[in-house]
């Protein structure tokens, strides 16, 4: 670039910084620009790997959607528990008025420190979310769910009134306001969403999410969570097999998926994932029904192997660290492993 042009550019940059504040414009190569996106673990080792950065990205919007009872709230509560382990503050905006504090506690959430709001209208919910984000002192904000964000006009109107597009307009306006603040304060904002069926779709997928298209565009990560089967002990159902697909990912390659078990009353089975991923990476040997680690048998059948790892957290942490190292998530292992050791 010739001298005159570089002087003109320097003057323009100086003017922008003077008018809009330091850091409002910078070169991508500057050392001040954070190249690494900070991530919050999801509590699922397989999903952290599928996301490519070791968890959900901070300073971004994330959408988690799926059918009823697929594990959407369980996954978000697990993220909250991981954030609290790192000393972060979490807020849960419960538009569905359905959060069970006892269940949240079982998943490792410190309920006494969790900020909770049960708003009356969609406008109120999104305004509260925006105020929490702008405060800069909340690390993760969860909105449960987009489908329950009812516009004020609909609540105050008659039962049969038509309110086409109101919710979509509300979401579009709120996300325009939220996005810049989320990035500036490095807050992770998670929207839980439900699935609806499009009428008259002959070809392609008839499923769609509620609240219009704005969230699809503004979300950096979109996760599709599904229940694929039941976990049984005899005739009793003790949990559900779950698959999560990374439908959109702006921070790493998308379309990866993770499978894990959600045990009722416990949440995501960390030990179950360690066994599955350990076998896939040949860190754990499987011969018939027996599982072995370093030549030593750890259990016959997955349930017994899971119980062994639960009783020996140091072995579980060792395999966990090896899996993360193999998947280039060594940094994420450093933030979670010590906490889990101290919890035992």
UniProtKB/Swiss-Prot annotation:
<keyword id="KW-0547">Nucleotide-binding</keyword>
<dbReference type="GO" id="GO:0016887">
    <property type="term" value="F:ATP hydrolysis activity"/>
</dbReference>
<dbReference type="InterPro" id="IPR049261">
    <property type="entry name" value="RecA-like_C"/>
</dbReference>
<keyword id="KW-0227">DNA damage</keyword>
<dbReference type="GO" id="GO:0009432">
    <property type="term" value="P:SOS response"/>
</dbReference>
<dbReference type="GO" id="GO:0003684">
    <property type="term" value="F:damaged DNA binding"/>
</dbReference>
<comment type="similarity">
    <text>Belongs to the RecA family.</text>
</comment>
<dbReference type="GO" id="GO:0003697">
    <property type="term" value="F:single-stranded DNA binding"/>
</dbReference>
<keyword id="KW-0234">DNA repair</keyword>
<dbReference type="GO" id="GO:0005524">
    <property type="term" value="F:ATP binding"/>
</dbReference>
<dbReference type="InterPro" id="IPR020584">
    <property type="entry name" value="DNA_recomb/repair_RecA_CS"/>
</dbReference>
<feature type="binding site">
    <location>
        <begin position="66"/>
        <end position="73"/>
    </location>
    <ligand>
        <name>ATP</name>
    </ligand>
</feature>
<dbReference type="GO" id="GO:0006281">
    <property type="term" value="P:DNA repair"/>
</dbReference>
<keyword id="KW-0238">DNA-binding</keyword>
<comment type="function">
    <text>Can catalyze the hydrolysis of ATP in the presence of single-stranded DNA, the ATP-dependent uptake of single-stranded DNA by duplex DNA, and the ATP-dependent hybridization of homologous single-stranded DNAs. It interacts with LexA causing its activation and leading to its autocatalytic cleavage.</text>
</comment>
<keyword id="KW-0067">ATP-binding</keyword>
<dbReference type="GO" id="GO:0140664">
    <property type="term" value="F:ATP-dependent DNA damage sensor activity"/>
</dbReference>
<protein>
    <recommendedName>
        <fullName>Protein RecA</fullName>
    </recommendedName>
</protein>
<keyword id="KW-0233">DNA recombination</keyword>
<dbReference type="InterPro" id="IPR049428">
    <property type="entry name" value="RecA-like_N"/>
</dbReference>
<dbReference type="Pfam" id="PF21096">
    <property type="entry name" value="RecA_C"/>
</dbReference>
<dbReference type="Pfam" id="PF00154">
    <property type="entry name" value="RecA"/>
</dbReference>
<dbReference type="InterPro" id="IPR020587">
    <property type="entry name" value="RecA_monomer-monomer_interface"/>
</dbReference>
<dbReference type="GO" id="GO:0005829">
    <property type="term" value="C:cytosol"/>
</dbReference>
<dbReference type="InterPro" id="IPR013765">
    <property type="entry name" value="DNA_recomb/repair_RecA"/>
</dbReference>
<dbReference type="InterPro" id="IPR023400">
    <property type="entry name" value="RecA_C_sf"/>
</dbReference>
<dbReference type="InterPro" id="IPR003593">
    <property type="entry name" value="AAA+_ATPase"/>
</dbReference>
<dbReference type="GO" id="GO:0006310">
    <property type="term" value="P:DNA recombination"/>
</dbReference>
<keyword id="KW-0963">Cytoplasm</keyword>
<dbReference type="InterPro" id="IPR027417">
    <property type="entry name" value="P-loop_NTPase"/>
</dbReference>
<keyword id="KW-0742">SOS response</keyword>
<dbReference type="InterPro" id="IPR020588">
    <property type="entry name" value="RecA_ATP-bd"/>
</dbReference>
């Amino acid at each position: 670039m010739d001298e005159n042009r570089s002087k003109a550019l320097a003057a323009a940059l100086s003017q922008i910084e003077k008018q809009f504040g330091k850091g409002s414009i910078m070169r991508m190569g500057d050392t001040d620009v954070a190249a690494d996106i900070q991530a919050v673990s999801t509590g699922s080792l397989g999903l952290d790997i599928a996301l490519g950065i070791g968890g959900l990205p901070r300073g971004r919007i994330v959408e988690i959607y799926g059918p009823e009872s697929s594990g959407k709230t369980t996954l978000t509560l697990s993220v909250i528990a991981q954030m609290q382990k790192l000393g972060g503050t979490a807020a849960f905006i419960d538009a569905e008025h359905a959060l069970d504090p006892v269940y949240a506690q079982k998943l490792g959430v410190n309920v006494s420190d969790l900020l909770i709001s049960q708003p009356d209208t969609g406008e109120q919910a999104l305004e509260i979310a925006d105020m929490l984000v702008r405060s800069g002192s909340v690390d993760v904000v969860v909105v449960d769910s987009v489908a329950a964000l009812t516009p004020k006009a609909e609540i105050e109107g008659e039962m049969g009134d038509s309110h086409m597009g109101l919710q979509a307009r509300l979401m579009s306006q709120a996300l325009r306001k939220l996005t810049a603040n989320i990035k500036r304060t490095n807050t992770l904002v998670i929207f839980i969403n439900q699935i609806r069926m499009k009428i008259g779709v002959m070809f392609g997928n008839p499923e769609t999410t509620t609240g219009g298209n704005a969230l699809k565009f503004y979300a950096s990560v979109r996760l599709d969570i599904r229940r694929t089967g039941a976990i049984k002990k005899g005739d009793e159902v003790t949990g559900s097999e779950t698959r999560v697909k990374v439908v959109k990912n702006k921070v790493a390659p998308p379309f990866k998926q993770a499978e894990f078990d959600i045990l009722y009353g416990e949440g995501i089975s960390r030990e179950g994932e360690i066994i599955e991923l350990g076998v896939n990476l040949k860190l754990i040997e499987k011969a018939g029904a027996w599982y072995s680690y370093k030549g030593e048998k750890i259990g016959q059948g997955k349930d017994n192997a899971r119980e062994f790892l639960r009783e020996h957290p140091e072995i579980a942490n060792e395999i966990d660290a090896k899996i993360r190292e193999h998947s280039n998530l060594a940094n994420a292992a450093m933030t979670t492993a010590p906490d889990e050791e101290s919890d035992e």
